[in-house]
């Protein structure tokens, strides 16, 4: 069971890492457009459309990645004091009441939304010669499907935690820098040099 959970985590992590490229593309595109507009006096109409599409891709594809890292915001005022079994019970109830129905609705509506867009070869209407928007709209059901897959993995994690009394391990990825640990490490290094 743990292998399956880690495999789903890995899929979500890879999808998040691949979509993180949109941050680099978005930054480069905005920098180029600022240079082109103010230095070359040659702005491009389509850049606005592409930037909001890249921004949307970044956030839609980050959902499953964030869920796989248990990184979504939650009210930890009481939750953090609960034992793992109680946490798992609350999570399990909330996954079935809110998460699964909401994500299924997202995928269902997203498939129709994308299919219509592909069928009519939809282009953006923000600019006169807007780029095609159907590739962007196809991301909606894909991101929803990845989020649903990760949600099922989280439900399995809750069930395992209810049985075992502790949370199963997650796939490790690059973590945020813990400032306190970093300060302690630097002060420890400074103490070594001073001694």
Sequence positions of predicted segments:
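Alpha-helical transmembrane segments and membrane-interface helix-loop junctions
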Residues: 1-195
